[in-house]
Amino acid sequence: MEKRRAVKENYPDIIDIWSKSVEHTHDFLEKDDFEQIKQVIPQYLDVLDVQLWYRHGEIIGFSALSKDHLEMLFLDPFYQGKGHGTTIIQIMINEGLKTVDVNEQNLGAYLFYKARGFRQIGRDEKDSEGRDYPILHMSL
C-alpha cells in the first residue's frame, strides 16, 4: 500500500471515487443532498490533509484528515471488503489518528470502525450542515 499527498489535479479522481463509494454505501442519502455535497467537496479538500491510496500503481481510494480526526475515507467499491480499508486505517492509527465521525445510517462504516477499536463517544441529530443525517462521533 502506498500513499501520496493529493493535489488539485487529483480532485476529479477523488470526486469520482467519492461518488462511486457513496452510491455503493450511502443508500439513505437523498439525491439532492448527494449532489449538494458533491459540489462542495473541493472546498473541503483544500483545507484537509488529503492522501491518495495506491495498490500496484492504481488509485484505490483517498483519505482526508484534520489533525488527528478522520474527515473522509472512501474506497472505490471494487476494492472494498478486501482488507484495504483495514490496512489504511492501521497506517493512519500508527500515524496518530484518534477520532472519526460516521453517519448513523451507515451501519457498515460504524461496524468497520468499531471492529478496529473505535468506540462511540457522542451523537448529533443532524450532520454539520443541518441535514437529517445523525452523526456518531467515535474515538480510540
Identify the function of each model-found stretch.
Residues 49-61:
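Conserved beta-hairpin
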Residues 40-52:
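A short helix-loop-beta-strand connector motif used in the catalytic cores of GNAT acetyltransferases and
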Residues 94-106:
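Conserved GNAT acetyl-CoA-binding A-motif
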Residues 69-80, 102-103:
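A short, internal acetyl-CoA/4′-phosphopantetheine-binding micro-motif in the GNAT/acyltransferase core
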Residues 2-16:
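A short beta-loop-alpha structural element at the N-terminal edge
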Residues 79, 83-92:
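Conserved acetyl-CoA pyrophosphate-binding loop and the N-cap/start of the following alpha-helix
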Residues 16-42:
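Conserved GNAT-fold acetyl-CoA-binding loop/helix
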Residues 103-107, 116, 122-140:
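C-terminal "cap" of GNAT-fold acetyltransferases
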